[in-house]
């Protein structure tokens, strides 16, 4: 039986009880970005149980319940990795490779910067784009607006690659409006 990790406290967010503050903070970050929250909705059997002829008890299935599904991306919130989790994670990787190769797995340690970093290469895959609008208007009174596949591409095209991503994360979450002269928003693509 696994030991309980110390300093992990349940937390409520929008009527849902999450098993840890990190999970609740991740749900809040996904919600602020306008992404659907799918929390622990599927159980994956990553190792099938079996019986041995010479043993009375059955070896039980090993099951894994992902913390969040964002499209076909699994987000697992882990502040601390136990030896049990390290082994189970290997079984999860093997299961996904063999059974659901289109599913992408990410483990996040915080609910903001690493979450955006994990999702950033996959916005289009999830049906989103990054809309960047300048705070300055041109001679015609229009602000520069462009859609980008990722924050990284937008930063490179705008010459901001040396700037920190943290303020942009706050802008994507609606906490801060203009960052480095631009408003950053996540926009659902219409297909």
Model-derived regions: residue spans:
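Electrostatic, structured charged patches in enzyme active sites and in nucleic-acid/phosphate-binding
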Residues: 1-131, 136-137, 146-175, 179-191
């Amino acid at each position: 039986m696994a030991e309980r990790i110390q300093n992990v406290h349940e937390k409520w967010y929008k009527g849902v009880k999450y098993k840890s503050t990190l999970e609740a903070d991740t749900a809040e970050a996904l919600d602020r970005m306008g992404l659907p929250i799918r929390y622990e909705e599927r159980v994956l059997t990553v190792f099938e149980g079996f019986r041995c002829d010479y043993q009375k008890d059955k070896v039980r299935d090993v099951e894994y319940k992902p913390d969040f599904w964002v499209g076909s991306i699994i987000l697992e919130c882990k502040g601390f990795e136990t030896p049990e989790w390290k082994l189970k994670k290997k079984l999860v990787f093997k299961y996904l490779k063999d059974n659901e190769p289109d599913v992408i797995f990410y483990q996040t340690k915080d609910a903001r910067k690493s979450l955006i970093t994990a999702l950033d290469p996959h916005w289009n895959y999830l049906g989103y784009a990054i809309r960047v609008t300048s705070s300055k208007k041109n001679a015609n009174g229009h602000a520069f607006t462009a859609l980008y596949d990722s924050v990284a591409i937008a930063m490179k095209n705008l010459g901001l690659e040396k700037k920190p991503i943290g303020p942009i994360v706050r802008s994507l979450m609606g906490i801060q409006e203009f960052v480095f002269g631009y408003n950053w928003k996540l926009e659902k693509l219409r297909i």
